[in-house]
Amino acid sequence: MPQEVKRCVLAYSGGLDTSCILAWLIEEGWEVICYMANVGQEEDWDAAREKALKVGAKKVYVEDLREEFINDTVIPAAQANAIYENVYLLGTSLARPIIARRQIQIAEKENCIAVSHGCTGKGNDQVRFELAYYALKPDVQVIAPWRLPVFFERFAGRKDLLEYAAAKGIPVTQTTKKPWSMDENIVHCSYEAGILEDPSMTPPKDMWKLTVDPKDAPDEVEELSIHFEKGAPTKLECKDGTFSGVVSIFYQLNAIARRNGVGRIDIVENRFSGLKSRGCYETPGLTILRTAHMDLEGLTMEREVRALRDQFVTFNLAKILYNGQFFSPCTRMLLAANNVSQEVVNGVVKLSVYKGNVTVLGRKSDTAHLYDEKLSSMDELGGFDPTWTSGFIQIESMRLRNSDEGKHWM
């Protein structure tokens, strides 16, 4: 009897690593379906498809996931003001659940028993992809070549891969390899490894792809306005026109931030594994969006609701996203809580951008009633009785007076 064919879906980029992994999987007896996810990165999709078929892929899927990516992870993260270790806006982390989910959907459609990826054995992405795989399809077989001795002992580095590619007739674009690795999507671009592994080294000017050097940005201030409904952007008004629809808004925010040098960071972060890693990130449009969103929350959200959201949702959602646990009960709970907090976040924020900086110029909301101009005014009482404050201060000071704490501070 003929042996049953083993079928696998490979997350394919068209680069040297995944092209060699494709050939190796075929060599190992797998029938491979290649899958490429368009999450907003620059890519010659037709050339990559042709390359995969030439190497031996049975079929190639090219999936446009940009709108799904923005709606399902980017906007919820922005509504929660999610940020990892106070600086990283999670651009890579946000894309991985969306990419992994479609890979599993294709695996089920094509009756594949396995999925594969080209992530290295030290990074975060292997964890993010595989936790998503197992959450969505617990019985799936995962092939991670860079963790298999049979693979990494054979292919110690780029030289071995190039020799294998030549032997297998895999077309390799002869370009000078940049001394760092990159990952790009509609939200950001990351740079790490190579020369960047020295945390004291200043990144070369030509590394940054998405934004101009702030010193080279225009000398004129550029203004824009972002409209929000329930914490999500619905309209962008700027000198280039009016834009609606999440993908259009993000592309335009990226264009504004790009020409004004907004959204660069250079950090050392803590990976899920405990290793420290140096990363340089450009997150242009999302940096502007987050600034506007946080400002509008100041006008529209009740103080204690915002404090609870900041302490529990913001911190924990960022950690969950970074650690690859998006498809978990915790995420559903956190997003449900955050959705309630965002019901009142409606309005418009006016901003300016200038040489790497984002500044809020004003905000307004037709539905928020927490801010009372007369009640807050220093020029009129507006219904506020100053004598109320005396009792408030007496009550608040009671525990301080009774604590005998003053002796430690005098």
UniProtKB/Swiss-Prot annotation:
Binding positions (L-aspartate): 120, 124-125
In its keyword annotation, does this UniProt entry include Nucleotide-binding? yes
Q: Where does the secretion signal sit in this chain?
A: none
Mind telling me what this protein is named?
Answer: Argininosuccinate synthase
Q: Quote the EC number.
A: 6.3.4.5
Listed InterPro entries: Arginosuc_syn_C, Arginosuc_syn_N, Arginosuc_synth, Arginosuc_synth_CS, Arginosuc_synth_type_1_subfam, AS_cat/multimer_dom_body, Rossmann-like_a/b/a_fold
- Main localization is cytoplasm
Reactions accelerated catalytically: L-citrulline + L-aspartate + ATP = 2-(N(omega)-L-arginino)succinate + AMP + diphosphate + H(+)
User: What do mutants without this gene show?
Assistant: Causes arginine auxotrophy.
* Positions annotated to bind L-citrulline: 88, 93, 124, 128, 181, 190, 269, 281
Biological source species: Schizosaccharomyces pombe (strain 972 / ATCC 24843)
* Gene Ontology annotations of biological process type: arginine biosynthetic process via ornithine; argininosuccinate metabolic process; L-arginine biosynthetic process; urea cycle
Q: Which enzyme type, at the first EC level?
A: ligase
According to UniProt, this protein's pathway is: Amino-acid biosynthesis; L-arginine biosynthesis; L-arginine from L-ornithine and carbamoyl phosphate: step 2/3
Q: What are this entry's molecular-function GO terms?
A: argininosuccinate synthase activity; ATP binding
NCBIfam families cross-referenced by the UniProt entry: argG, PRK00509.1
- What is the superkingdom listed in this entry's lineage? Eukaryota
* Protein family membership: Belongs to the argininosuccinate synthase family. Type 1 subfamily.
Positions that bind ATP = 11-19, 37, 116-124
What are the annotated GO cellular component locations? cytoplasm; cytosol
Q: Which UniProt keywords apply?
A: Amino-acid biosynthesis, Arginine biosynthesis, ATP-binding, Cytoplasm, Ligase, Nucleotide-binding
Q: How does it assemble?
A: Homotetramer.
Q: Which CDD domains match?
A: ASS
